[in-house]
Amino acid sequence: MSSLKQELTEKIKENRPKLGLSSLKTYVSILFNVHKAMESEDNKLEWYSDNVKDILEFVKGKNNQSLKTCLSALFVLTGKQEYREVMMQVMQSVNELYKQQKKSPTQAENWISEAEVKDVYFAQLENALHMLSTKKIFSANKYIEFLLVGFLSGAVIPPRRSMDYGELMIRNYDPKVDNYYKAGKLYFNKYKTAKTYGLQTLDVPAPFNLMIKRWIKLNPTDYMLFSTNKQKLSSPQISRILNTAFGGKNISTNMLRHIYLSSVYANIPALSSIDRLATEMGHSPAQAMEYIKH
């Protein structure tokens, strides 16, 4: 780890001791990349406080969701109210879109229907079955692409956040700490709201479970999904794989969750259904309501 990354990590831990590990890593990565992209030669943490105006100008081109996270990281690190004020403006803008049930420009440009999502899944399933029956053409990368679409599209199970599956293990796991698959069930200890909801489990439908079991026999690693260097997948890697699976569209996990909930809650069903699905997707009922778009 570089000296700057180490200092960022320690300072954020000091300022937010209860911040989850995933959020900590995200904040450090964002802050380090802003510093790198702006080509600063000043490697002191004070740089983030001394150059507020220039940094705000640099990051303003990000989409609202990314900008909100970036500003949150900057505020947690520095405590500068300028970052917080802009962050609150962005959050208000995002919430207004949700209230009006409108899509952002990026979402509108890349939005696809639930039926189109299912078409992609079934095309992926057909290709995976073909690879299994013809071992000579088997590609681990393509099979991982199929599994990711199955896990995250909503065509098979309610779609959780990408890193819930990036952390998913199939062997040598600690059942009290790790996310893991066992005997047709998914167990989640690591996810964004784990401190609130604790361990969550999800049953895997039998047909998809069969595909998982066949994959585990071929998988040489401890993780359900892995990169070309046999390490667990990162969020950016998962995003790139999804973009490929959906024909080059900018389809993120967040958008797939929006598409799924927009379909499920099209006519706003009973709150009990909202509560149940929110739990299965690893977030709060309030956030589920915010996701609804038409």
What are these model-predicted stretches?
Residues 22, 163, 275:
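Residues within the helices of the helix-turn-helix
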Residues 13-95, 255-258, 282:
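Non-catalytic DNA-binding core/recognition domains of DNA-processing enzymes
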Residues 119-162:
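Basic, Lys/Arg- and aromatic-enriched nucleic-acid-binding interface segment
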Residues 85-133:
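Flexible interdomain linker/hinge and immediately adjacent N-terminus
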Residues 145, 150-173, 267-271, 281-282:
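A short, glycine-centered helix-capping/turn motif at helix boundaries
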Residues 255-284:
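C-terminal catalytic core of tyrosine-transesterase DNA break-rejoin enzymes
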Residues 163-206:
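Conserved tyrosine-mediated DNA breakage-rejoining catalytic core shared by Y-recombinases
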Residues 203-260, 265:
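Active-site/catalytic core of tyrosine-dependent DNA strand-transfer enzymes
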